[in-house]
Structures are given as C-alpha cells and as structure tokens.
Amino acid sequence: MSDNNRSRHITEGVARAPNRAMYYALGYTEADFQNPMIGVANGHSTITPCNSGLQRLADAAIEAIRVSRANPQVFGTPTISDGMSMGTEGMKYSLVSREVIADCIETAAQGQWMDGVVVIGGCDKNMPGGMMALARMNVPGIYVYGGTIKPGHYKGKDLTIVSVFEAVGEYTMGRMDETDFKAIEQCAIPGSGSCGGMYTANTMSSAFEAMGMSLPHSSTMANEDQEKVASAAESARVLVEAVRRQLRPRDIITRASIENAVAVIMATGGSTNAVLHFLAIAHAAEVPWNIDDFERIRKRVPVICDLKPSGKYVATDLHRAGGIPQVMKILLNAGLLHGDCITITGKTVAETLANVPDAPPPGQDVIMPIERALYPQGHLAILKGNLSPEGCVAKITGLKNPVITGPARVFDSEDDAMSAIMDRRIRDGDVVVIRYEGPKGGPGMREMLAPTSALVGQGLGETVGLITDGRFSGGTWGMVVGHVAPEAFVGGPIALIREGDSVTIDAHQLLLQLNISDEEMAARRKAWAQPKPRYVRGVLAKFGKLACTASRGAVTDAFEE
C-alpha cells in the first residue's frame, strides 16, 4: 500500500488537475503528491494559558513532518477555557466543545483525505475531543499534549488554579485577608500550560500515554520546557512512520489498552471526567465498554501517586519521579497492565517499559511502590441506588466521613447553589443537590468546581455532601457525587428530591439513596413534569437534543443505541 493511499484520491489522475492546481498555489511540487498528507490539528489559542504555548509545538511538528518526506497540512481547532468559564453560563459550552473539536478534526481530515493526523491540544476537552476524532476516523494519528503548567508559589507553598477557587471560600469566611487573596490570585498560574495537578487535562494526557497513543514521558512534561518541543517533533516523526506502516488508532485503542489507561487513572488519582470521556472514546472506537468496567478496575488497582487535588504534588513532580512510564512499570510488574498492547511506536507496552526501573527512585514520595500504596483500591467509584440507577461517579479515597446522611438542600441550577453557599446558608451535615445541570438539562453538564471549592474554603469540604447531574472539575475533592444518571431533565430520580428529604451517600456500600418509600417515589414521579428546554436555537440547543445519558458518555452520535 502506498504512503499516500488516502490523499491520492484528490491528487492523482487527469480529473484531479483542478485539485492539484489548488495545491500548487500552496507551494507544492509535483513530487510532493507522492508523499503522505499529514494533518496538524493545532489547538493554539490565546484564550487560555492551557493553549497559549501550542504554536511552537505545532511548528516543531510541521518541520519534523517535512524532514520525514511528508506534507504538513495545518488547520485549527477551537477551545474553551474551563478555568475561565467556570461558575458561569460559559461553562455550558465546555463539554459541547469536546464534540465540536471531534467534529472539526473529523471534518477537516476526512474532507481533505489526509493520510495521518497529529492532534495538538491543551485544555481539558481538547484531549477527549481529539482522541474521539482519531478513533472515529481510524486514520493513523498521534496525540501531542501541550504540556502542564508549572506550579505557582506564594509563602513557600505550591499553587494551582484550585488554590484560587478555594481561596474564594476562605476569603468570604474571613479566614484570609485581602492581601493574601490577591497574591494567590496573581501568583497561582505563572505561565503557559494546562492546570498543574492531576486534574482533567493531565489525567487524560497520562491515560493517552498509557493507552499507547502518545509518546512515553510526554504527558507530564511542562509546556515551557524545551523537551516538550523535542517531544512534539518526535511525535510527528513517529506518526509519519505509523502512516507508512498503516498502524491505525483502532490497532492501539482496544479494550485491553483502555483497561491500561483506566488502571493508570486509578493509580494516579485522576479526574472523574475520565469516566465520561473514556466512555465517549470507547464509543468512538467501537470498543465494548460500560460504566461498570471502571468499578471492576478500581477494585484491583491501588492509588500509588500522591498528587493534587487531594494529595501534595503536581505533574512536574511526577515527571521528575519517573513519570507515567515509572507508574506503568510498577503496575505491569504487579500484573495490573496488559504488556502485549501495541503502541504508536510499534512497540508493545512491555517492550516500551523494558528499561524502566522496577522501583520508583529513592528520596521521593510522589510515586510509591505497590506495597506502600496510598490506598489499596482506586479512588473513582461508581455508586448506584434509587437516586442513580444508571450509576454516578465519586472520588472516595481519603474521605474523613465516607458516609453521610443528611437533609437535602435542593437547587435547580449551579448559580442558585453558589448563592446559597456564598451567603453561608449551607450547614454541617447538609447534602447539597444541584440538578437540571446534566447533558440535556443544562444543557452541557457544567463542572461544579466553584461551589465545591467554596465549600472547602469555608471548612465544609469534609462535612457537607454534594450530588449533581452535572460534572466536577478534575480539581474537585470531598464528599461529592457527579454524573448522576438518569439526569433530572429526563425525569431521573434526582428530579424528585424535595428540600429537607433525607439523602445518603455511602462510599463503603457504593450507594446513593433517597430515603423515601417506593410508593412516595412513584407518586412524585407521576406528578413530575418535564421543564421546557433552556435553549431552542444554537449549539447548546443542538447538544441538549442530541446528547445521550452521562452513563454512556454524553456523546451526540449514539443514534443506534
């Protein structure tokens, strides 16, 4: 098979003379048409520091493609800054952007018959959006993560974006003066790169490396470091070789490799969003995968990394301690990874890890050996019960109060809940319910970092529960339960909770329960009426109409299911 087996459809033959004329206008020569056309999906943007450092990575990839005797074709992809839109109506567009990014890449690459695609992204939804596109198309591809941000510093402490959100709660409670508050705001993010803890972007990049769709060590590099530029160039070179070997995403993205990715997510204490996104990626790759698979893996994989938001360290610390290859080697030796999975380099996981030390380096406590794991089981649990028969997601490790039964404080939007928190109307023992924020009801399934961080800042993070049919940021921690499905907008049980009802969150029993009788539940369901959609035009209306349930990834193309 030729290197240009796709692009030749628009470059070869008499009938394609007009097509070639367009290429000549771009500086192509006749000889170039024999070489593969490689798309570079460039997420560079000055909207957010997560993406502001991507252009030099794209430039390095473009040059490496040329040196590899291939033709780079650059196109842009949009981004939304989760950190900037958080707590506002703009956050409704965040999950929507995952679908838009996937559609943009698929549209450009398929419309132009590209032979391979290098996807370069930074902020949270860039990650799954790009991988979903590669999995859908099954055109040779590689993911280049833009890199993490370095931590900020103030008064001897490392800072991240979550430090600022939590400072809001402390400031409103009078526990922090204005000088410290402003200093944290101004020092938390010192430069370009994605948010520095094991939040969503770093979680997904680590998982992509574990799955074999990104190069070893690439997921924990800092954006501002030169090694990140070199890694982008090497990624492009490897992708051109994959095109020539016809190594495709679905050769790599298999049930076994997704199990590897999820094992690493559990071992590193990754984001709840990974559950939603890997359901979507598996759907795109046509890999059988469901929400219960996460629970199966959680029960056998320990947490061995002490990373923010609930731990001490950030991604750059993990990188210095050996990065994802070190984590994977520990898991592989423990029989917790599939070593025979193929990776984008053509090597298996076991071959890739052959020269990685068996034990983490001494003198550090970022990565722990299995026998000294922080927690014996993973942290991302799937809870079920009469409030979430399809399942929901919670981080359950390290909780001081793993069981809470308390009165429901019910809010039909994040905004109303945030007002109550800021007005100090939430008390110890309450269970905050934020509903009509699901994929269809929001629409867009907003992240609840603002209210959860405000609760933490007010000293309520360990004593107040919070459940929602929306999502959580990767920076969220505490007794919080998200992705409750079915969602309120379609009549899920969360829609039937009333102010003051007794609600139980039980991390031990993996239970989310509304403590009323079945008869009362049935009566409330009969009386419930679906509200009108909040949007009837535009992209939010389209997403609300098309998105499936969170328990299947909230994708917009699940038509056959």
Swiss-Prot record:
Q: What class of enzyme is it?
A: lyase
Q: Which residues form the active site?
A: 473 (proton acceptor)
Q: Which residues carry this modification: N6-carboxylysine?
A: 125
Instruction: Set out the biological process GO terms recorded for this chain's protein.
Output: isoleucine biosynthetic process; L-valine biosynthetic process
Q: InterPro entries annotated for this entry?
A: DHAD_IlvD/Edd (IPR050165), Dihydro-acid_dehy_C (IPR042096), DihydroxyA_deHydtase (IPR004404), DiOHA_6PGluconate_deHydtase_CS (IPR020558), ILV_EDD_C (IPR056740), ILV_EDD_N (IPR000581), IlvD/EDD_N (IPR037237)
**Recorded catalytic activity of this chain's protein:** (2R)-2,3-dihydroxy-3-methylbutanoate = 3-methyl-2-oxobutanoate + H2O; (2R,3R)-2,3-dihydroxy-3-methylpentanoate = (S)-3-methyl-2-oxopentanoate + H2O
Question: What are the UniProt keywords, alphabetically?
Answer: 2Fe-2S, Amino-acid biosynthesis, Branched-chain amino acid biosynthesis, Iron, Iron-sulfur, Lyase, Magnesium, Metal-binding
Required cofactor(s): [2Fe-2S] cluster; Mg(2+)
State its Enzyme Commission number(s). Answer: 4.2.1.9
Q: In which pathway does it act?
A: Amino-acid biosynthesis; L-isoleucine biosynthesis; L-isoleucine from 2-oxobutanoate: step 3/4; Amino-acid biosynthesis; L-valine biosynthesis; L-valine from pyruvate: step 3/4
UniProt function note? Functions in the biosynthesis of branched-chain amino acids. Catalyzes the dehydration of (2R,3R)-2,3-dihydroxy-3-methylpentanoate (2,3-dihydroxy-3-methylvalerate) into 2-oxo-3-methylpentanoate (2-oxo-3-methylvalerate) and of (2R)-2,3-dihydroxy-3-methylbutanoate (2,3-dihydroxyisovalerate) into 2-oxo-3-methylbutanoate (2-oxoisovalerate), the penultimate precursor to L-isoleucine and L-valine, respectively.
What interactions and quaternary structure are annotated? Homodimer.
List the protein's name. Answer: Dihydroxy-acid dehydratase 3
